[in-house]
Amino acid sequence: MAQLHLTEEWDKVFPKSEKVTHRKVTFHNRYGITLAADLYEPIHADGKLPAIAVCGPFGAVKEQASGLYAQTMAERGFLTMAFDPSFTGESGGESRYMASPDINTEDFQAAVDFLSVQENVDPEKIGIIGICGWGGMALNAAAIDTRIKATVTATMYDMSRVNANGYFDSENSEEQCYEKRKSLNQQRTDEYKTGAYVLGGGVVDPLPEDAPFFVKDYYDYYKTDRGYHVRSLNSNEGWNVTGCMSFLNMPILQYSNEIRSAVLMIHGEKAHSCYFSKDAFANMIKDNPCVENKELMIIPDIVHTDLYDGGGKNAIPFDKITAFFHENLK
């Protein structure tokens, strides 16, 4: 396995809590990629604890929103771990700045592998939290991994749908889909000729005055002191242009209605992305024999990025999330 070089100083975009301990750890997935993570434990905790793995948003790093969720849930009595997915952040994987519906789902399962063998973790009490694009990956992991007893998604993106169909399904005609595939495959040829990948750019900067409101929201998080991080793809030069190509014909939520374990999906009413959670929830409960432990929570007056860090509104319903995990990791 690759030896990672991890930053030891505290370089998160949120303050360090005095209520938890923190240390860097590594683990590997079944493709041999070594992943970097921050492990948070409640101070003075005894015995075997329920554990939660956290990842996302898509293009973010563990020093941003996922770390905030992990640290906060550790303050509330859980052993938690925020990790960088394969090919990004401090984690391994070549080429860089790629995403894969298979490998990134496996990243969540590998996190469960790691947590399951920790001496102070109860392996029967493991949950996951997926934020933004990793919300869809979390549901995909829950559909295949019976060790995951509870799943929370926050401001979820369906990365298969948005890559294939564009925002609001605005690029889903047969001709548009064909032209998208044609363009991406030409890009592959060009990159193979030059031997170098082209980055697509992170959040647009400078920000045009006529940018959609959600792009302005992304800018306010990723490009300012609120959430900027040097290793974040969204804060800097973005994903490889062809890095998300495999999502075009690999629908990650295909088997979500086979999830038996508990699921809480959280979204802001005013989020541009809210349709992802509404539709995913409807598909998840369709013909699913286990619907009593599934819940969709829509929060009024909240936009997509408010659920990254609270948006200055205390928007993240940590009390609700805590109660959900207490109920389902027991």
Regions found by a protein language model. Name each.
Residues 48-57:
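Short beta-strand element of the alpha/beta-hydrolase
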Residues 72-92:
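Conserved alpha/beta-hydrolase
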Residues 98-119:
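Alpha/beta-hydrolase active-site loop
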Residues 302-314:
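Catalytic histidine-centered segment of alpha/beta-hydrolase-like enzymes
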